[in-house]
Every structure is written in C-alpha cells, then in structure tokens.
C-alpha cells in the first residue's frame, strides 16, 4: 500500500467516523461508509488540505469511492 493510499484511507476514516479497517479501496463513501453530501464536502476539503491541492467541484462530484480519491490524489499531487 502506498503512502498516499494510507493517508487517504486515514483521512476518510477520521472524517467519516469509521474504523480504518473498514475503509476498502472499493468502498463507496455514501453506500458503504454512510457519508451524506455534507460529509463528502468535508472529506474533499480535508483531502485538499492534507495534500495541498485544489479539487474543483466538478471533479469532487466524481470522487465517490476510496479508490477514486486515491487515484485523483496520485494524479494531481506534486
């Protein structure tokens, strides 16, 4: 597991109040982890802050799973 993947999963677990072991790559924020739209917005903001990047709203709407978040950060980080 990459460092970015570990960080993303940790942030997701903290933001959504779930056990980090329950955060799987294929997990949907809403369907599997119980996030609502506000949780998702706060999660995107936490990812932006942690990785020093800006995630435009149109991209944020497409980030619906843990793997999509990891892929986005990998593609846009640094």
Swiss-Prot record:
Molecular function, one GO term: acyl binding
UniProt family annotation: Belongs to the acyl carrier protein (ACP) family.
BP GO annotations: lipid A biosynthetic process
Purpose of the protein: Carrier of the growing fatty acid chain in fatty acid biosynthesis.
PROSITE patterns in the record: CARRIER (PS50075), PHOSPHOPANTETHEINE (PS00012)
Subcellular location: Cytoplasm
Residue ranges annotated for the Carrier domain, each copy included: 2-77
Pfam families membership: PP-binding (PF00550)
GO (cellular component) term, any one: cytosol
HAMAP family: Acyl_carrier
Protein name: Acyl carrier protein
Species lineage: Bacteria, Pseudomonadati, Pseudomonadota, Betaproteobacteria, Neisseriales
